[in-house]
Amino acid sequence: MSTALDGIRVLDLTDRSGALAGRVLADLGAEVILVEPPGGGSIRRLRPQLRRERESERSCAHQYLNANKKSVVLDLADDQDRERFLAMVATADLVIDTERPDRLDELGLGTDDLLAVNERLIRISITPYGQHGEWRHRKGVDLTAGASGGLIWVSGEPKGTPVQGGADPSYVMGSLAAASAALVALTARDEQGGSGVHIDVSLQEATVMTVMQTATPTLLTWQGRIPRRPGLSAVVRCADDGYVGLLIRPDRFERFLAWCDAVGVDHGMTAADWEWSLLNAPRQGNPVSAATLALASVLTRDEFAAGALEADLVCLPVLGFDDLADHEQYVVNEQFLTVRHDPLGRELGFVRSPVDAMADGVVISRAPMLGEHQHLVSRPVSRPVSGSVSGSAQAPGSAGSVMTTTPDPAPTAPTRSATHPGQALAGLRIVDLGWVLAAPIGTRLLASFGAEVIRVESSRKPDSMRNQLGPDGTPDPDLGGLFNTVNAGKKSFAVDLSTDEGLALVTELIAGADAVVNNFRPGALDRMGLGYKTLRSIKEDIVLLNMPGAHRKGPWAVRSSMGNILMAASGFNMLTGFPDERPRGIGIPYPDFTSPHLLVATVLAALRHRKRTGEGQELHLSQLSGVVSLLGVEWMAYQSGGDLPGRRANRDLNQCPHGVYPAQGSQDGDYPGHDGPGDEWVTVAVSSDEEWEALASLMGRPELGTDDRFRTLDARKTNEDELDRLIAAWTADQDKWACAERCQLVGVAAAPVENLWDTYHRDPQLRHHYQIVHQPHAPDVDIPIDREIAQWIGFDHRLNRSPMLGEHNEYVVRELLGRSEADYIDLIVNDVLG
């Protein structure tokens, strides 16, 4: 059992939208206490459900997301229970909640009230749209976060209805952002000596971050282009009706042609046609696509995957849940397990923890029965003027609320000496060997919060992110919009690791570092001479994080991988989209955005462990395993009932109607790349019978609210096809923004499906999301980048630009490594640097 967060107490006030945050902290060793209302939290009643169990214990979401936690029951509307809660706050480190903005203030439990009891308390709030802005009181669910965050727009078939990702990806991203923020804030408080802080996590902004590659803002600001579906999702149907996920890179193009020749596919290409394999190559008339389809027409799924492996292409099979348990890759790595639930008298199916990278492992214990740990409730105590006892953050509570016209209060400066977020990790040095997205985004998070992150790279084998287009349409190593977003705030040390001198420099640099991060294939670091045994001989307490695409072992361990291909092999794609369409998944490389927060959480947890024990450790954080672990609710339902979960398109088991409906376009008129009418959409999600009655009245059809076909959730689900037709007919002639606002005014969650133009120019809630940075050699070029998801209330957290290639060579060699100017010049002359 991981003990990294031993001694940390978390009060968890979350619903489904934030429950994963507390689960991650519990898996890392924190004591996480669910504070539930009488009758239990709403997550206990969600579908899918275990069969033949009492109502409060049957929800798979509760059993999976609340594993390793404890449960107490308190009515926070009751005076005595509020005092009992405050007494618990006095001994807590974190409170995580999903309550609507101002809800806890109305109960006398706002941030100031909590800090008055415990000035070292960290509060993290996860809400649909954050604590500030015009939309802060709007209701929101995963569907609306995906719509307003730009993810749904890039997901689905090019001419089809946009699709929501399976297994609630916006809830996942918000929860993971909260968990990583908790580790950052704990580090700041305990290492910098600061007091508590209130951290704001918006599900919408967490979602916007996931489209940073598919919908990089500079595509719009420099190229006048709006990315369209299907984004970065590519799957191919094979001869046996199975599917594979495939990416053909330019450096493997000739091997692809050789494979086509061996199979007998006539492709008509030569090595000179490699540009057709670029990600941004035209889709129409692409001979690479034609050759791929020809291969798939004569090969089964497994034959295709085996041939691609032989050609060293990035390819994995698209797997469903019925494939996973017995697949060698997952069996070898013990991906799935069962947990005994004695009170229920049964075994429950689980997936390995998302943070199982910890060297001391993660043991999973069953979720608590309602009120099982009531003995932990403290007696009411008089409130101190200020507290010095370490406290814990609670998990989010209710994600939705009826929109009101309450004015948005201006953020107030903290009254206590909380650490500035930009200095939260000051004093930590990270050597970043990361490549492309997954690891570099994680180290960007560390850099944004004050760690010194030194990116080790080389002009001789540059990261593909260094080849992004600049404002003039040609590749530029320093100006690329995505590169600047992914590497904001870092330093760059350009060195040739293939030379003895270069390797010696990096080895010496690591000797003064706290952690080393990489996302190479297993064994690559050892072959470079930088394996864990070597690093321990350099610095005994070093923390090394390896983040391979698949696992350390198994047939896929040595394969090249990309996020969207891993997504396809995880089971995710078979939970997403319409049953009659290709299982594309969503239009982003999903693991590239879940993994960074897990990287931050595990690295900081390992450093916390080192602080207490003096021990470093090697962490193995599989991107594939991490994504599979995020499908645990669906996996548990499948294991308990045997029913294969299907692709439910935009429908939901707990909300109905719940979908993406046709609408009209922006009232501001056309925009670059807009195809005109026919591709504008609005999302609507009804969570209760009362909300359905309100929506029916808004539609001018109040009789539908009490119609037996639609009066209850079960009735609406039975008649969902007819219901969707009614909703679509109502939304079709409305502007998507106005329609969503009308729904919100009557208490129904709704949001426009936003494209890049909408998120960058139109959405008032995202007005401050994009920050502008400049490079010294191009001061007039505005480069928009995404700000951090976790906003520390009361602070202006501005990010720095990314480094120019080799910008900090002299700093590293002379200041950090203590070499002379003459030595530095020799390294340049001998081509060791650069």
State each model region's role.
Residues 144, 166-183, 203-211, 231, ...:
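Mid-domain beta-loop-alpha active-site segment that forms a flexible
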Residues 185-225, 233, 304, 317, ...:
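Substrate-binding/catalytic subdomain of NAD(P)-dependent oxidoreductase enzymes
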Residues 232-311, 315, 399, 657-746, ...:
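Aromatic-enriched alpha-helical interface/lid elements that frame and gate functional surfaces
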Residues 1-9, 235-237, 321-429, 651-656, ...:
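Terminal low-complexity tails and localization/encapsulation signals of metabolic enzymes
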Residues 307-330, 744-766:
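Conserved PLP cofactor-binding pocket of PLP-dependent enzymes
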Residues 39, 128-130, 203-208, 240-242, ...:
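Glycine-rich beta-alpha junction loops
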Residues 1-192, 218-222, 291, 302, ...:
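N-terminal helix-loop segment corresponding to the beta1-alpha1 unit
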Residues 162-173, 196, 227-233, 243-245, ...:
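A short glycine-threonine-serine/GTX helix/turn-capping micro-motif
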